[in-house]
Amino acid sequence: MENNHSVVDQVNKYMSYIYLILFVGITMWYYLYSTVLEYKYPYALYLGLRYALMAYVLVSIALVVWQKQYSTVLEPVFMVLILVSAGVVTYVVKDYGVFDFALLLVGAKNVPWKRIAYVYLCIAVVIQGVAYYAATTGIIADITLQADRGIRHSLGINYPTDMAAHVLFIMLVYAALREKKLTFVEITMMGVVSYWVYGKTLARNDFICAMVMCLLLLVVKVLGLCNIQLSKYKALKAGSILMLVAVVGCVMAVTFYDPANAVYQKLDAVFSNRISLSYQGLAQYGITAFGSVVEENQAVLG
């Protein structure tokens, strides 16, 4: 029995290494694609990694079922459903990033999340740093946009909002890795960086998210110093569905949007006209179960 367990552990160990290698290749592809860096990532290499990841996921699901590494029988079923739904969406809207993300998500089963986070952080910080240096020294273009609030800088990324989103995700992953070791100085620095990024990009929504993140980190840190562990309160587990609540809330806000309502006007202004824009898109194109292709001003979006 011990020999069987040791074999299983070894298999899982090498499978996790394979996953991390594939994760590095595909993450670099998408991250570089979001920058203005003039580096051509070989498309053939990306396709090879993609097909290798597909094979890995199939083997991974088979091992999960064979070794019974699931808390409920619905878990492997749910893994397959994720892949099927992502595959249908990709087929309809031709956005292969959806299926790639599903592959990475399902493939992460039995891979320590901290290893994935460390790898992502290393890739993100290096590419982000190189892109920023190249943009600020004139090696590559710093794409700028004129807005009512001023000039928005992209700092080496394709779009100002994307630049702010990249920095936000870097801070989120960093905070998750630090956990209880995160200090007040680090939280303050994240707030300062967020404010600086906002000053350059004028990406309001990302700035709001960053400030909420810093505020929540401060609250958790203070409560921890008072020996109050939030994980002990079962009622707080409801927080795990906040993302679903947010999605439903956004759909309802768009569905019942009233341009003449003062509250809606204020809310729409806070979110940079995202609600009114979505309302127009809903009125013109509707919502389909697996997405649709939208053509606007000669641009095709999934």
Predicted feature locations:
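TM-adjacent membrane-interface loops and short helices in multi-pass inner/ER membrane proteins
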Residues: 276-302
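Hydrophobic transmembrane helix bundles of membrane-integrated enzymes that assemble
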Residues: 7-31, 47-262, 283
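Short, intrinsically disordered terminal tails adjacent to the first/last structured region
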Residues: 1-5
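Juxtamembrane/transmembrane-helix boundary motifs at the membrane-water interface
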Residues: 30-49, 299-301
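Conserved phosphate-coordination/catalytic loops
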Residues: 272
